[in-house]
Amino acid sequence: MSKLSNISAIKIADDFGADQFHDDAMLTLLEDGKIDGVSIFSELLNEENTRKLKNLKDTHSIQIGLHFNLTSGDGLPNVSELLRNAISRSLDVDYVVDSLVSQLNIFQSKFGYLPDFLDGHQHVHSFPLINQVVSK
């Protein structure tokens, strides 16, 4: 049990950028120190919330990560279809790489630096093939 006492839990809220109601709640939790960071949909994040997150990072040392998205949005497969394609190895790896690079570039253009961490919307970062891409 003593080894566990050296481990600290990091509390991260995901889906930041999906809608203003939840974004406002997460901003309040960050300001109050109730959570340690957020993972964002880089393609959905607006300028005002980008500014607020930058300020909180400066004043509260929060973590801001990329919430890698391959399943939510027009023209994207649902999570079941994506998982089937990943397991059967029929997933287009170039598409995954291009999506990741695009989302990282958007993040960097908004914040001026790369994310503190990366996770996946609907845990897609743990799917076969996708986990190999995000691990590189």
Label the predicted regions.
Residues M1-F21, M26:
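Boundary/entry segment of secreted carbohydrate-active catalytic domains
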Residues S2, M26-G33, E47-G65, N105-F111, ...:
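Acidic (Asp/Glu)-rich catalytic clusters
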Residues S8-I10, I35-S39, S61-H67, L114-F117:
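Structural preference for beta-strand elements that scaffold enzyme active sites
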Residues K11-F16, L66-F68, F117-F127:
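Histidine-centered catalytic micro-motifs
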Residues F16-Q20, I40-T50, S72-G73, H123-L129:
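Acidic-and-aromatic substrate-binding clefts and catalytic sites of carbohydrate-active enzymes
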Residues S90-N105:
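Alpha-helical scaffold elements lining the catalytic groove of polysaccharide deacetylases
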Residues Q108-K136:
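Catalytic domains of cell-wall/extracellular-matrix polysaccharide-remodeling enzymes
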